[in-house]
């Protein structure tokens, strides 16, 4: 019994370093918010301007990797000996469900405003040209390109899971073919895992920092409770307590049911917006935007604005590519887990088609609605953001729809459930990654899960205290830098091992 406890307890070398690093950064930030904002602006400017090109080339190279997987020698290789665990319809639905987080609802509702008010390519703000390129850029940032780049990592993890039968809970486990077992399980592997965990903690904290204001603004609209930082902190605390109760009482089945509810409610809410906002305009705008995307795609892929220095690619494209990089391992592990028995080609095509459809639907419907409200002078979004913040502006885009009270209740429930499941997933992923071997069917220790959910909650509160989107963007970009190299190493390790193992099969 004693040995079992030791086996399933924390792994000190990957538990304490991220905890200490993140704790110190939070303490330094809270100690002087003004100084922290100065540092944040400097870090953001340095990474995006000096190293932004690297993120763009990373995405382009990984896109070529997708074509190699689909049409290359491994295209028909099966990821596991079993038949697919899920039907194709269920598989695609699970992919869609993974895209309906509160952070996605945040960006989907407001992103187009930023693209129109500060457009790329030297276009005039709020001009016809800016509006034409607005949704096209959303389709670029959340379309086939980033999902194609996830294919390589998803295939890699599925290969290690189901072909090589490796128990992978941290990225270092996949690096044995590349650097050898000694280094993968030694100091080098520990450093890689700590980079991954610190970045993942900040990524999850930023998602919480985006989601929480949506819920508290909904509460203000529905119940008249003023939105303050204290209310944000109270709501996050309630979520953490609710998560702890669910874990302690064995209510994980209830959390899974809530996750399914989130998916169905997402369909319902998007369908409602599509119908009442203007289905004909949305379809016309989407069609036009696909054409604009195809016309400008080469420039979008390589756009750094080195001469004009308008800042658009640094503020958005580099930021989003870092966002995709930082979530790549976590998301790819999930996609690999649900893809057992699929061929490499099936997984690559399924991801690009299924996941692109989900994100394009979200951004097209929500972005078109926001644009219509601006064009019809129903909402003054710049004024709302200046006086009340971004979250209030997002809430008002939903409140402006017919049956506003019912719509707001639906949006409130959707955001609340999405954030509950987010915290549950955060605590589970971090606990699994920082504990010794946890067998199938077992849960990581309760206190470890609660501890990580508390830390993620603290990061969310700190980012909210800093105010604005820049701290959130900087946290993502800073976290994406080390994972940039980790993702490349995992990819190279897969290529090296598959070249030997799949050579004669």
Swiss-Prot record:
InterPro entries on file: BCCT_CS, BCCT_transptr, BCCT_transptr_CaiT
UniProt xrefs under Pfam families: BCCT
A GO molecular-function annotation: (R)-carnitine:4-(trimethylammonio)butanoate antiporter activity
Disulphide bonds in the chain: none
Stretches that traverse the bilayer: 10-30, 51-71, 92-112, 143-163, 195-215, 231-251, 263-283, 316-336, 347-367, 403-423, 446-466, 475-495
Localization of this protein: Cell inner membrane
Pathway(s) it belongs to: Amine and polyamine metabolism; carnitine metabolism
One GO cellular component term noted in the UniProt record for this chain: plasma membrane
GO biological process, one term: carnitine metabolic process
Membrane topology per record: Multi-pass membrane protein
Catalyzed reactions: 4-(trimethylamino)butanoate(in) + (R)-carnitine(out) = 4-(trimethylamino)butanoate(out) + (R)-carnitine(in)
Function according to Swiss-Prot or TrEMBL: Catalyzes the exchange of L-carnitine for gamma-butyrobetaine.
Subunit: Homotrimer.
NCBIfam families in the record: bcct (TIGR00842), PRK03356.1 (NF002887)
Name of this chain's protein: L-carnitine/gamma-butyrobetaine antiporter
The organism of origin for this protein: Salmonella paratyphi A (strain AKU_12601)
């Amino acid at each position: 019994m004693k040995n079992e406890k030791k086996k399933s307890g924390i792994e000190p070398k990957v538990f304490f370093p991220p905890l200490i690093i993140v704790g110190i950064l939070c303490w330094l930030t809270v100690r002087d918010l003004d100084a922290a904002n100065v540092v944040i602006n400097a870090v953001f400017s340095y990474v995006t301007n000096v190293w932004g090109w690297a993120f763009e080339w990373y995405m382009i190279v990984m896109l070529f990797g997708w074509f190699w997987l689909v049409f290359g020698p491994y295209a028909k290789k099966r990821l596991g000996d079993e038949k697919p665990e899920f039907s194709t319809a269920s598989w695609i639905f699970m992919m869609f469900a993974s895209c309906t987080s509160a952070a996605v609802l945040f960006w989907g509702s407001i992103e187009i405003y930023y693209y129109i008010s500060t457009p790329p390519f030297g276009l005039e703000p709020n001009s016809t040209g800016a509006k034409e390129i607005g949704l096209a850029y959303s389709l670029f940032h959340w379309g086939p390109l980033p999902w194609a780049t996830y294919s390589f990592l998803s295939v890699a993890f599925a290969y290690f899971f189901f072909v090589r039968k490796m128990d992978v809970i941290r990225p270092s486990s996949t690096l044995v073919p590349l650097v050898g077992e000694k280094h993968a399980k030694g100091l080098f592997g520990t450093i890689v895992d700590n980079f991954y965990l610190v970045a993942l903690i900040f990524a999850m904290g930023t998602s919480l920092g985006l989601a929480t204001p949506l819920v508290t603004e909904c509460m203000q609209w529905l119940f008249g409770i003023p939105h303050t930082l204290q209310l944000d902190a109270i709501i996050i605390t309630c979520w953490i307590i609710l998560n702890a109760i669910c874990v302690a009482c064995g209510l994980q089945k209830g959390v899974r049911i809530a996750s399914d509810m989130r998916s169905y409610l997402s369909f319902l809410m998007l369908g409602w917006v599509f119908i009442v906002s203007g289905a004909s305009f949305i379809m016309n705008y989407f069609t036009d935007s696909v054409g604009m995307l195809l016309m400008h795609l080469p420039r979008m892929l390589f756009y750094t604005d080195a001469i004009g220095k308008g800042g658009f690619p640094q503020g958005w494209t580099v930021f989003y590519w870092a966002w995709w990089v930082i979530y790549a391992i976590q998301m790819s592990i999930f996609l690999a887990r649900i893809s057992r028995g699929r061929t490499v080609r099936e997984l690559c095509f399924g991801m690009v088609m299924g996941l692109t459809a989900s994100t394009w639907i979200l951004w097209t419907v929500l972005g078109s609605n926001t644009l219509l409200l601006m064009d019809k002078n129903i909402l003054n979004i710049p004024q709302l953001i200046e006086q009340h913040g971004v979250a209030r502006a997002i809430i008002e885009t939903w409140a402006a729809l017919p049956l506003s009270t019912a719509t707001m209740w639906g949006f409130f429930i959707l955001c609340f459930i999405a954030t509950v499941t987010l915290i549950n997933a955060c605590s589970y992923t971090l606990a699994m990654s920082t504990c010794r071997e946890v067998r199938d069917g077992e849960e990581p220790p309760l206190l470890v899960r609660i501890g990580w959910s508390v830390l993620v909650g603290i990061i969310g509160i700190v980012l909210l205290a800093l105010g604005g989107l820049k701290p959130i963007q900087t946290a993502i970009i800073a976290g994406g830098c080390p994972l940039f190299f980790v993702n490349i190493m995992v990819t190279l390790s897969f290529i090296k091992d598959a070249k030997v193992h799949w050579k004669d099969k």
